[in-house]
């Protein structure tokens, strides 16, 4: 028993109890244990990992059915995984990517599909430039303080896209961009929140790219190893199948009760679960009004992650890498990536069923989803081999009661400016982690590590172990996965938008017409 503790009425006394055994909670517990803090992790599921989950069987060896991707500028998760001896490998984009739109397949290379229509090109260019420029106005640690926060928080991303885009081509791709990045619909999410989300991931190119972007790499053996290995380090300080139902901090010691009626005491609590899931916990005293309102207003995104396995990577015979961007309302999958193992074994394509499509297709039998996906791949890749998979894995995150969805919680219009400032505010001796509370790569594993370690340092500060100025720590860049600067050409920076072009051409036409009239007027009359 440390000098922090008073006699326990439960016999289970700890300095800190962490609620949630995902990457965020376990990163917090690991850091606390390194300071010799007596910590316990309570995890609701019968496994650790949270929204990361590595399935292992003879058909797949291992497969990440949850969070999997990591890339440059995600320095905390790269540092943590390296410390645990987990290596990364690059997602294959050596061959051509594919865009499928209006029933046709268009191969391309690079982060974004090329656009041949001049007006659509101007529209695309202006869309990405405008989103990035708006994002630069938003403080990553306090988006509610942005100069236009109130204005942007009142509208949805659909409203903003419809305002920015003049062509149907750019508008529909922008809708898909929202679906892919936050597994939600453009009409559901606040423009302020989405612009902040893209900004804190490094901008439109960084968040969407494979090479030099958020999807550049995966972990050899699966991302689930991160949580599993931290659990091994913590030993018996991680308890599974222990959903927390009650927290009482009215006395010197906080009392925690689980669903199976086990009781624990501690001095501090770190909640490392999605905000909406804290509504499953009874608090005494009750949560402050703003916190209580916030947790009721942050829905989770909707996604089904699907992996189709084949005898061989047949798509490579056509010089395709396996990445498909699919713009088709009837298509189950919106985006894919090659999910073949780094040694070339277990050829597979990973695809996401996103947002409205996840809700719709979840009603079908698994075999029907599998068939629809294979038929889609056959059509997009132009190969009947897609119809003959050897195995299929999927994970519907909407049915996970201890996640509520994936990838992350989103802010509907009006919520960020009204309640966003309390997302990280402690409630008494309860501190908040979880990827939603991060300021860099929120929604990703990187954000989970940032949030967990920051919450741990907040507790360490309360315990007198670290100074207040050391709660927020700047992470050095990974030497193994350095980030390349994202640059834009002179034309990309300076090309006009479609309305800008119309103004220019309209003015030019008017001047030419005026000159013609003046010329005619000055001619001698016969």
Swiss-Prot record:
EC class: oxidoreductase
Pfam families found in the cross-reference section: Amino_oxidase (PF01593)
TM spans (from-to): 498-518
Site feature Important for catalytic activity, where: 374
Documented EC number(s): 1.4.3.21, 1.4.3.4
Cofactor: FAD
Ranges per topology, Mitochondrial intermembrane: 519-526
The reaction(s) this protein catalyses: a secondary aliphatic amine + O2 + H2O = a primary amine + an aldehyde + H2O2; a primary methyl amine + O2 + H2O = an aldehyde + H2O2 + NH4(+); serotonin + O2 + H2O = (5-hydroxyindol-3-yl)acetaldehyde + H2O2 + NH4(+); (R)-adrenaline + O2 + H2O = (R)-3,4-dihydroxymandelaldehyde + methylamine + H2O2
KW Nucleotide-binding (keyword) present: no
Keywords for the protein's UniProt record, in alphabetical order: Acetylation, Catecholamine metabolism, FAD, Flavoprotein, Membrane, Mitochondrion, Mitochondrion outer membrane, Neurotransmitter degradation, Oxidoreductase, Phosphoprotein, Transmembrane, Transmembrane helix
Membrane topology: Single-pass type IV membrane protein
GO biological process: dopamine catabolic process; positive regulation of signal transduction
Residues carrying Phosphoserine: 383
Molecular-function annotations in GO: monoamine oxidase activity; primary methylamine oxidase activity
Residues exposed to the Cytoplasmic side: 1-497
Complexes and interactors: Monomer, homo- or heterodimer (containing two subunits of similar size). Each subunit contains a covalently bound flavin. Enzymatically active as monomer.
Function: Catalyzes the oxidative deamination of biogenic and xenobiotic amines and has important functions in the metabolism of neuroactive and vasoactive amines in the central nervous system and peripheral tissues. Preferentially oxidizes serotonin. Also catalyzes the oxidative deamination of kynuramine to 3-(2-aminophenyl)-3-oxopropanal that can spontaneously condense to 4-hydroxyquinoline.
Protein name: Amine oxidase [flavin-containing] A
Lineage of source species: Eukaryota, Metazoa, Chordata, Craniata, Vertebrata
